[in-house]
Amino acid sequence: MSFLTVPYKLPVSLSVGSCVIIKGTLIDSSINEPQLQVDFYTEMNEDSEIAFHLRVHLGRRVVMNSREFGIWMLEENLHYVPFEDGKPFDLRIYVCHNEYEVKVNGEYIYAFVHRIPPSYVKMIQVWRDVSLDSVLVNNGRR
C-alpha cells in the first residue's frame, strides 16, 4: 500500500452534508508525543483563516479552534483521546448545519460550532506524526 505525503493538502468545496474522511495511523515520534493535526483553510495557503482546527496530542487531549484575521480564537479542549499510537484510525468530520460533528472509529467525540461558514473552506491540510492511507471528501451524509 502506498501512503500519502505528509503534510497532505487537498483542495475542497464543503457544504452541509459533506463528510471529510481521514484514514491513517499515528506514528511514534521520539522527539515528543505523537500528534495529528487537521486544518480547514479558507484559501489555498497556510496564512489564510482556519475555519476548523483539530489537533490531537496523543495521551493528553484533543484541541479544536479557529483562526480569524490571523488570531487564534477560544480553544475548545477534549480530554478524552480516542486515538492509539501505532493503531489505524478512521476520522470523520461531518459538516452539519451548525457544527462539525467529529467521529473517530465510528464513535462520536465532539461537535464544534461553526465560527466561519463551511462554504468558505478551500483547502484541507493533514499533518504532523501521521502515516496517511487516504483523505477524501464525500458529499453524501454517510
Swiss-Prot record:
InterPro entries from the UniProt entry: ConA-like_dom_sf, Galectin-like, Galectin_CRD
Listed SUPFAM superfamilies: Concanavalin A-like lectins/glucanases
Annotated coiled-coil segments of the chain: none
The organism's place on the tree of life at top rank: Eukaryota
Galectin domain span: 6-138
Keywords (A to Z) from UniProt: Apoptosis, Lectin
Protein name (database record): Galectin-16
Native source species: Homo sapiens (Human)
